[in-house]
A protein has these predicted regions:
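EF-hand and EF-hand-like Ca2+-sensor regions
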Residues: 60, 78-85, 99-136
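N-terminal export leaders
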Residues: 4-8
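EF-hand Ca2+-binding helix-loop-helix modules
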Residues: 25-36, 41-60, 75-82, 100-106
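C-terminal segment of classical bacterial N-terminal signal peptides
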Residues: 17-23
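Blade-edge motifs of beta-propeller repeat domains
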Residues: 68-70, 91-97
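Bacterial N-terminal signal peptides
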Residues: 10-17
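Acidic carboxylate motifs that coordinate Ca2+ or other divalent cations, activating on Asp/Glu
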Residues: 42, 62-66, 89-91, 111-115
Length: 136
């Protein structure tokens, strides 16, 4: 028969091994900026992949399905100033073309080596994180 002390120590020992928490989904996303973006699995993000992700996000954010995003739908992805600058036609909303133009601008800023693709280290910069906010 196992003593109560032995049973408790066994539970604590197993608990100690198992107590290292698994990463949460948000931690995984932070650790892997490419999660779901690098569709050709080449380890980089190109402008086409970025624009496809941005277009898909645009469609998800367009809650009222009017083909544009207002400040509420964009949320914190853009500051009020950035939103106003991107709103070329000054209608108070962003069309998909206006949204994708911002994505292209941010992609070019994040592409510090000007190779036309973004590596993980480029996505972890301030400019890279600003781009990722428009993609996820």
């Amino acid at each position: 028969m196992i003593s109560r002390r032995t049973a408790i120590l066994s539970i604590l020992a197993v608990g100690g091994v198992l107590s290292d928490p698994l990463p949460t989904l948000s931690q995984t996303k932070r650790a892997d900026p490419f999660l779901g973006l690098d569709t050709d699995n080449d380890g980089t993000l190109d402008l086409d992949e970025a624009q496809k992700a941005a277009a898909a996000l645009f469609d998800r954010l367009d809650i009222n399905h009017d083909g544009t995003l207002d400040r509420h739908e964009v949320g914190s992805r853009l500051s009020a100033r950035e939103f106003a600058a991107a709103d070329v036609d000054k209608e108070g909303t962003l069309t998909k073309d206006e949204y994708l133009a911002i994505v292209e601008q941010r992609f070019k800023v994040a592409d510090t080596d000007k190779e036309g693709t973004l590596m993980a280290k480029e996505l972890q910069t301030k400019a890279g994180r600003a781009l990722v906010r428009l993609l996820k």
